[in-house]
From Swiss-Prot:
Keywords: Cell projection, Cilium, Cilium biogenesis/degradation, Cytoplasm, Cytoskeleton, Nucleus. GO terms for molecular function: gamma-tubulin binding. It comes from the Eukaryota. It holds the Pfam family B9-C2. Its main location: cytoplasm. This is B9 domain-containing protein 2. Belongs to the B9D family. PROSITE patterns: C2_B9. GO terms for cellular component: centrosome; ciliary basal body; cytoplasm; MKS complex; nucleus. The gene is B9D2.
Amino acid sequence: MAEVHVIGQIMGATGFSESSLFCKWGVHTGAAWKLLSGVREGQTQVDTPQIGDMAYWSHPIDLHFATKGLQGWPRLHLQVWSQDSFGRCQLAGYGFCHVPSSPGTHQLDCPTWRPLGSWREQLARAFVGGGPQLLHGDAIYSGADRYRLHTTSGGTVHLELSLLLRHFDRYGVEC
């Protein structure tokens, strides 16, 4: 089977109005993909930007996949959360990006968004925290479900991923 190695890091995030940010991440693939090593999901530590608005995470990603075809190429889905001084967490943004399909090192910028909710929910978010969240995480990368949502943009998550492709020519898989 053809193999894909994804090695890199979630470097951090910029452009969020909240501070004390952390990121929950996961990888989604099609049925023809098998994870040989690594973990499908994880979470960074909380970072409060000291200078500027960059939250630094430097969270490692190391995945090794085997596949029979290109359909269902891996996608990273991200959830950025903020934590207040009482330890309460609220959503700062959802985002996703496709893992690049060419070998080498890639710098990716993943824009994020969050559901707006009604004016009452927005008012409650401003004073109490919380706010609307998605019931199903599939809506993050499924455009068919996402177009009905009223959203606002969040910040940007910065990633650095290196890809190694192996045995694609041997198994007749063309990138």
